[in-house]
């Protein structure tokens, strides 16, 4: 029986990962969560994990509910003996547990794009040193991974990520009118609040471009974004002979989570079959309407700590927007200001965390 650790178990991806584990009959040996007491309690009761990580404020109540429960840090949960760790703690908070999982040599099903964006070269160095696998959970990167299977790297001309365009592809005309409630209504995907807002600004696609650059170790100038409102095509690879290879599937993250857990095998699912689409639209992204995508590309051109800074600044800006402190168009403005002020230093674990802290404070100044 395959043993799985789920980091970020009470979040959207974490809960869907547990659904996949239930369908596949896997053993969940470790859970790491935040402060959602009731959701975590249900998971502990169902899975009876060996170790659990949660915010310290929950420890007393968890001990009362589950007297024999062993509490630990997220890094200790990540290091448990298991075949796979699902890394789904969002933001830079998920980086240390992801690194801990990589250092134990297990497969890491990576849903935390910020970890790869900020620390891609460092994580790959750790993975190669410890014999770990890193497989993507993001639908677009899973699509590219699948389309690249069996192909020679020198035959690949371009990687193409698709974006639904989010809820504001065409309206309202004035994005200053956008409220948090409007931004949280994504037309296609079931996701957490932060990534849903990022999808609305298209910064999520920018992060995915940077993730693709680091995950596939591919030149930024050969990674393209196309708006695809139907969201049937999740990613395409263009080859040097002009042909294209695409992955299509339903807009259900469980499909991509399962693939990261079962690869190289495929397993049956109870998911609905994709209806054969009548029309597939592909549009160029409007960088004037969605400048956050342009900021992400500029961060990618600078590389290293610039990617760390914009990722950290975005967490602060999105939280400020969700709290009603700033208007929607202010998010990309904050990212651009932080990027311009980012110091140029070599990327190390120490400089990464230092710039992450600096960028958050800098973003708060503008928020």
From Swiss-Prot:
Keywords: Isoprene biosynthesis, Manganese, Metal-binding, NADP, Oxidoreductase
Needed cofactors: Mg(2+); Mn(2+)
GO biological process, one term: isopentenyl diphosphate biosynthetic process, methylerythritol 4-phosphate pathway involved in terpenoid biosynthetic process
Record has Ion transport as a keyword: no
Pathway the protein takes part in: Isoprenoid biosynthesis; isopentenyl diphosphate biosynthesis via DXP pathway; isopentenyl diphosphate from 1-deoxy-D-xylulose 5-phosphate: step 1/6
Coiled coil residues, start to end: none
Positions that bind 1-deoxy-D-xylulose 5-phosphate: 113, 139-140, 164, 186, 199, 204-205, 208
Keyword Plastid: no
Gene Ontology terms, MF aspect: 1-deoxy-D-xylulose-5-phosphate reductoisomerase activity; manganese ion binding; NADPH binding
Catalytic reactions of this protein: 2-C-methyl-D-erythritol 4-phosphate + NADP(+) = 1-deoxy-D-xylulose 5-phosphate + NADPH + H(+)
Name of the top EC class for this enzyme: oxidoreductase
Classification via Pfam families: DXP_redisom_C, DXP_reductoisom, DXPR_C
Binding site for Mn(2+): 138, 140, 208
EC numbers: 1.1.1.267
PANTHER family, A to Z: 1-DEOXY-D-XYLULOSE 5-PHOSPHATE REDUCTOISOMERASE, 1-DEOXY-D-XYLULOSE 5-PHOSPHATE REDUCTOISOMERASE, CHLOROPLASTIC
Protein's name according to its UniProt entry: 1-deoxy-D-xylulose 5-phosphate reductoisomerase
Species: Thermus thermophilus (strain ATCC BAA-163 / DSM 7039 / HB27)
């Amino acid at each position: 029986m395959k043993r799985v650790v789920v980091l970020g178990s009470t979040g959207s991806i974490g809960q869907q990962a547990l659904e996949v584990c239930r369908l596949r009959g896997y053993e969940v040996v470790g859970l790491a969560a935040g402060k959602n007491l009731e959701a975590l309690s249900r998971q502990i009761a169902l899975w009876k994990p060996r170790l659990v990580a949660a915010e310290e404020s929950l420890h007393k109540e968890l001990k009362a509910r589950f007297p024999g429960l062993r509490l630990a840090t997220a890094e200790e949960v990540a290091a448990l003996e298991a075949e796979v760790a699902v890394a789904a703690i969002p933001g830079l908070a998920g980086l240390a547990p992801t690194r801990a999982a990589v250092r134990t040599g297990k497969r890491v099903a990576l849903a935390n794009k910020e970890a790869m964006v900020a620390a891609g070269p460092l994580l790959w160095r750790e993975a190669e040193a410890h014999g770990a696998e890193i497989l993507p959970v993001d639908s677009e990167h899973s699509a590219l991974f699948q389309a690249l299977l069996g192909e020679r790297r020198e035959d690949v001309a371009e990687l193409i990520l698709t974006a639904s365009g989010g809820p504001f592809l065409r309206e309202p005309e004035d994005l200053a009118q956008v409220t948090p409630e409007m931004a949280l209504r994504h037309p296609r995907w079931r996701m957490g609040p932060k990534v849903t807002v990022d999808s609305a600004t298209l910064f999520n696609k920018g992060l995915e471009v940077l993730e693709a650059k680091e995950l596939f170790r591919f030149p930024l100038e050969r990674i393209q974004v196309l708006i695809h409102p139907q969201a049937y095509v999740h990613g395409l690879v263009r080859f040097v002979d002009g042909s294209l290879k695409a992955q299509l599937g339903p807009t259900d993250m469980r499909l991509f989570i399962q693939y990261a857990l079962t690869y190289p095998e495929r397993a049956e699912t109870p998911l609905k079959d994709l209806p054969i689409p009548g029309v597939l639209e592909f549009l160029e992204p409007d960088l004037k309407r969605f400048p956050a995508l342009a900021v992400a590309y500029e961060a990618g051109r600078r590389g290293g700590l610039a990617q760390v800074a914009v990722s950290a600044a975005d967490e602060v800006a999105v939280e400020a927007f969700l709290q009603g402190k700033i208007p929607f168009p202010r998010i990309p403005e904050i990212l651009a200001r932080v990027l311009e002020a980012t110091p140029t230093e070599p990327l190390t674990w120490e400089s990464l965390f230092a710039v992450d802290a600096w960028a958050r404070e800098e973003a708060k100044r503008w928020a």
